[in-house]
């Protein structure tokens, strides 16, 4: 059984962008969108397998029929920061409602020497 819980988006982004053992602490703030663990797993898979390393403008949608939540992830820009390959990625998450909430977040992550991505 999946348990719904209030998720703090920066922590979600840390889980999405960092390897499982590489989770990082980030500043936190509340969100109106409640995501399930299955939602988080879908977002992580999209970022890891279909967004990182792809051309700028790549936009991949995700939808979880079990929770009713959906959204998309978009690679907005590639850049070099302190000699590291980095990507600016936008996240849009939409709740099943009612009411329906849509929230947008933007993070820059950089490729680490060990092959993981870390939010900077």
Region locations from a protein language model:
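Bacterial N-terminal signal peptides that target proteins for export
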Residues: 1-9
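Bacterial N-terminal signal peptides
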Residues: 9-18
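Sec/Tat signal peptide C-region and signal peptidase I cleavage site
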Residues: 17-25
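Extended interaction-bearing regions that mediate binding to partners or small molecules
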Residues: 24-120
């Amino acid at each position: 059984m999946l348990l719904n819980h209030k998720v703090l988006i920066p922590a979600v982004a840390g889980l999405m962008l960092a390897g499982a053992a590489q989770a990082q602490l980030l500043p936190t703030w509340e969100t109106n969108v409640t995501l399930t663990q299955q939602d988080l797993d879908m977002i992580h898979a999209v970022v890891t397998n279909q967004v990182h390393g792809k051309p700028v403008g790549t936009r991949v949608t995700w939808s979880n029929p079990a929770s009713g939540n959906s959204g998309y992830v978009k690679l907005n820009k590639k850049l070099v920061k302190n000699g590291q390959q980095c990507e600016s990625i936008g996240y849009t998450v939409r709740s099943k409602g009612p009411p329906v909430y849509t929230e947008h977040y933007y993070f820059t992550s950089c490729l680490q020497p060990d092959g993981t991505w870390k939010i900077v």
